[in-house]
Amino acid sequence: QKNGIISENGFNIKQLKDFQNLFEKKDYTCKLYNLHDEIQNLNLDDYKAHILVIKNGVKLFSEPDNIFNTLNNLKWDKKYFDLRRQKVLNKLARYNLCFSNFNQEPDYENKKGTIYNISDFDCLYKLNNGLKTFGEEFNNLECEGNYYFDIKKCGIGYHGDAERKKVIGCRFGESLDLNYWWYYQYKRLNNKITIPLDHGDIYIMDEKAS
């Protein structure tokens, strides 16, 4: 099940720098990662990607601990419909749920997961509305939650997301790395890029990074 309408364009480097400037004016520490530094010797001008990390940026809009506790107490989807096997299976890599402007009970047989109305949760609603004050680019966004219930065992492999162009993420709970690895013509290039994320951090990807 896909929620919302995919954006025509993702974020660009100018927008990321503008967001960085807005947060830094409010005394938040930011770091803009140039993911293409790892392949600069290959002269791949069209392969420029960036990700902006705002340390503890959630704090500007809402209390990270309250959000973590709220999320921790929700009912998460632990099952999904496997398209290849055509049956409902248990989730092993992570649990999921979504937030939108309506509620939905899961119906795994019909490929539908749990959706909560974000306005029912004050701490999340404040975060969502707070981001909107930074520009129209943050309007009409859908929200997906990924619960890595055991960070020593959980996780997903390297992938790109064709299903979305705008990516704004928040980290809650234990620190966890976000890793990138460049691929070109089906081959892995150079070194892994590791971006550390801590409780309360916000990260924003440009379109290529997503």
Where are these regions (language model features)?
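Non-heme Fe(II) oxygenase metal-center motifs and adjacent flexible, charged/small-residue loops
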Residues: 1-210
